[in-house]
Amino acid sequence: MKRIILTLCLATVACLTAFAQKALFEKYSDTDGVTTVYISRNMMRMMGNVRAGDKDISKIASRLDYLKILSCERPSLIPSIKKTAQSIFNQQKYSIVMQVNEGGEHTTIYGRNYPNGKKEFALLAIERNEITIINLLGNISLQDIQGIAGGK
């Protein structure tokens, strides 16, 4: 009985987390100057070369459950998107796994582990006139994400 209750609790937490991330992307999906993209596992399997913006993710595409991208080149929206994203990352107990500040670009990679062994990473890249959030869930490692962030 304890196992059933624990399993239900974990499933509920996973659903709430997915809902919070979904809310971020949906909040800005119909906003002028904001581009949102959702790519499912099935779609990634059908595509040969998978790119997230200028990043090649073909090497890990088969291990992903989904890929979400939010990109905004409208400077007036950047503070709001940043604040919303960071609030969600804090509320959902993401940990900062890597930060890079280089030439005016600030990149933070947040991560979380799930009980089923899957990992979720959110890459938040902020430049002077642009913000990009890339959210990935699957059987992936930090090294995979660093390869994407570094453009390898």
Regions found by a protein language model. Name each.
Residues M1-E26:
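Bacterial Sec-dependent N-terminal signal peptides
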Residues F25-S76, S80:
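Early exported N-terminus immediately downstream of N-terminal targeting peptides
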Residues G33-T35, A61-Y66, I96-T107, Y114, ...:
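Extended interaction-bearing regions that mediate binding to partners or small molecules
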Residues V34, R41, S80-K83, E102, ...:
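Solvent-exposed interaction surfaces and binding hotspots enriched for charged
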Residues L64-T108:
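Mid-chain, structured segments of secreted extracytoplasmic proteins
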Residues R112-N139:
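A short, solvent-exposed beta-edge/loop patch
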Residues T132-K152:
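A short, surface-exposed interaction/processing loop segment used at functional sites
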